[in-house]
Amino acid sequence: MSFRKTHPLIKIVNSTLVDLPSPANLSVNWNYGSLLGLVLVIQLITGIVLATRFSGHSDMSFDSVISIYQDSNYGWLLRLVHSTGASFFFLFIYLHIGRGLYYGSYVYPEVWNIGVLIYLILMGTAFLGYVLPWGQMSYWAATVITNLLSAIPWLGPTMVEWVWGGFAVGNPTLTRFFALHYLLPFVVTALVILHIFYLHIYGSSNPLGISSNTNKVSFHYYYSVKDLYVYFVFFFVFMVFTLKYGYVFMDAENFIPANPLVTPTHIQPEWYFLFAYAILRSIPNKLGGVVGLLLAVLVLFLFSVSTSKLLFSGTIYSPLARLLYWSLVSNFFLLTWLGSCPAESPYNEVALVATVTYFTFMLTMCALPHISTYLYLKS
């Protein structure tokens, strides 16, 4: 037998990337997973290198970022690659989740739930990284988001002080945020390996939404070459954004050192959190806003409930499901835009309506496969 099939370590890679049986009809929509793996590697490498020159101290953090730009060889490039990579990471995550919803990938509960868990941890990791440069937006975003814990009855105020390490966001907060931002990507990497492990046990979905057990092809060369082509396209677009538009995803306020005495006119997170931020702001009650913020993501877990009994999944053969799906996508874009708008009328009222429709579309899409299966069996 071939060496790659007998060596105890190489054969694991072989079964994952070479001889993996794959559906013969996978489209470009199935490339986002491999792109996410590539971006994760880029983020890990650039993050570890940047950590060697970064100082997680409130007095030196902002200056250390400037030092990385000015005093380190290609430090400016590493920092821009890392910050731009975060935006591309979440872009591919949303496309990956969107493809999963459209084609019914939630019928594999273990794969789906681990994926949603990865998304949750990545949201936390990205938020921690947003705080590290210790600019104005970093400081006040940390203050606003950590203050949400105070909405928890009884324990809230104590938990806020515990997270802060004092009575306000300061050096202890930054130090522990830096430590967590460094460690969490390795947790994500472990979950990604588990995600791929379960994916290879249950198999992949496909554009037709039917079993592909009778029509499989080897992953290499067919899909490995296809992935390489997409990698080249990604690298071209990624480097254009990094080198020509490197600051387009950054907030101008974050180029000002953190000042606890001056509040920015408009506090907002990065673009990939704006939809959740709009939901948080749209609900007048503080606890209600926090619950809405959590449910905006946790609602994805509902899709994997009782999927073993489903005869229909995804939107492929249902015009109503497709209408709901694209309405949800439009609603997501609307919430993202509203999250970047000032917290005033009429944006608050529109955001509240968009929040209600977001959960309506989500819950209806979640229930529709079960309703369709019930009506089919009843008839």
Swiss-Prot record:
Cellular localization per UniProt: Mitochondrion inner membrane
Claim: Membrane is one of the keywords in the record: yes
Cofactor(s) listed in the protein's UniProt record: heme b
GO molecular function: metal ion binding; ubiquinol-cytochrome-c reductase activity
A matching Pfam family: Cytochrom_B_C
Superkingdom assignment: Eukaryota
Residues where heme b b562 binds: H82, H181
CDD domains listed in its UniProt record: Cytochrome_b_N
Binding-site list for a ubiquinone: H200
GO annotations of cellular component type: mitochondrial inner membrane; respiratory chain complex III
Transmembrane residue ranges: 32-52, 76-98, 111-131, 177-197, 223-243, 287-304, 320-340, 348-367
GO biological process assignments: mitochondrial electron transport, ubiquinol to cytochrome c
Record's bilayer topology term: Multi-pass membrane protein
PROSITE patterns in the record: CYTB_CTER (PS51003), CYTB_NTER (PS51002)
Amino acids binding heme b b566: H96, H195
Cofactor note: Binds 2 heme b groups non-covalently.
Keywords: Electron transport, Heme, Iron, Membrane, Metal-binding, Mitochondrion, Mitochondrion inner membrane, Respiratory chain, Transmembrane, Transmembrane helix, Transport, Ubiquinone
Family: Belongs to the cytochrome b family.
Entry function: Component of the ubiquinol-cytochrome c reductase complex (complex III or cytochrome b-c1 complex) that is part of the mitochondrial respiratory chain. The b-c1 complex mediates electron transfer from ubiquinol to cytochrome c. Contributes to the generation of a proton gradient across the mitochondrial membrane that is then used for ATP synthesis.
Assembly mode: The main subunits of complex b-c1 are: cytochrome b, cytochrome c1 and the Rieske protein.
Name of the protein in its database record: Cytochrome b
The organism of origin for this protein: Brachionus plicatilis (Marine rotifer)
The gene coding this protein: mt:Cyt-b
